[in-house]
Amino acid sequence: MIKYIALASVVLLVGCSSTAKKPIADDPFYAPVYPDTVPTQVAATGSIYLDSQASSLYSDIRAHRVGDIITVTLKESTQASKSANNEIKKGSDLSVEPVYAGGKNISISGVPIDLGYSDSMNTKRESDADQSNSLDGSISANIIQVLSNGNLVIRGEKWISINNGDEFIRVTGMIRSEDINPDNTIDSTRVANARIQYSGTGTFADSQKVGWLSSFFMSDWWPF
């Protein structure tokens, strides 16, 4: 009977587990954004100079329109540490005075009746956790929206195929046009509401995942 209960518990745990959605290379959400094509009426004057193809010596070539490309320089570094100490002490004492009857101390085999009880408990827990991450590189992204206040919403991804797996970098966020460098780049630290994802798919990425049984032992469901 115990075997069947254990087997049923394992089946229920496996059934409750969820599988995360795997990223795909051609995700429509990260598809390139193209600017709207507006036909320009150009008068045929016979001149080799055309206003539609001219650019000023003082014009700004930095990205500022929907569909323009901007390069995000990834300079991310995070470090966190956490420690916790917890100590619980509990004690109780109970004593009963000698029992008297008729002015005499009641005893058993000459030993007076005297009850006493003492209990104490001491629990102490200590935990430390350290984590640090760094990400350096660059990725080009599209401007997908120009807000009314001039801020730009960007989005882009990069996929790299290596051996039996793929690695990808994705970035989304909001930037100010004033923070764009003259070479049309911007530091990732200047991206507001940034969502930067660096991961991979394939055999190497799967080998770094924790199995469902190990996840159970490290979850809150494990009583110990």
From Swiss-Prot:
Pfam families with a match to the protein in the record: FlgH
Alphabetic keyword roster: Bacterial flagellum, Cell outer membrane, Lipoprotein, Membrane, Palmitate, Signal
First-listed, main subcellular location of the protein, grouped into a coarse class: membrane
GO terms under cellular component: bacterial-type flagellum basal body, distal rod, L ring; cell outer membrane
GO annotation, biological process: bacterial-type flagellum-dependent cell motility
Keyword Lipoprotein attached: yes
InterPro entries the UniProt entry points to: Flag_Lring
Lipid attachment locations (N-palmitoyl cysteine): C16
Highest rank taxon of the organism: Bacteria
Signal peptide: 1-15
Annotated membrane topology: Lipid-anchor
Lipidated positions per record (S-diacylglycerol cysteine): C16
Subcellular location(s) of the protein: Cell outer membrane; Bacterial flagellum basal body
Gene Ontology MF terms: cytoskeletal motor activity
Assembly with partners or alone: The basal body constitutes a major portion of the flagellar organelle and consists of four rings (L,P,S, and M) mounted on a central rod.
NCBIfam families according to UniProt: PRK00249.1-4, PRK12698.1
Function: Assembles around the rod to form the L-ring and probably protects the motor/basal body from shearing forces during rotation.
Family membership: Belongs to the FlgH family.
Protein name per Swiss-Prot or TrEMBL: Flagellar L-ring protein
Organism: Shewanella frigidimarina (strain NCIMB 400)
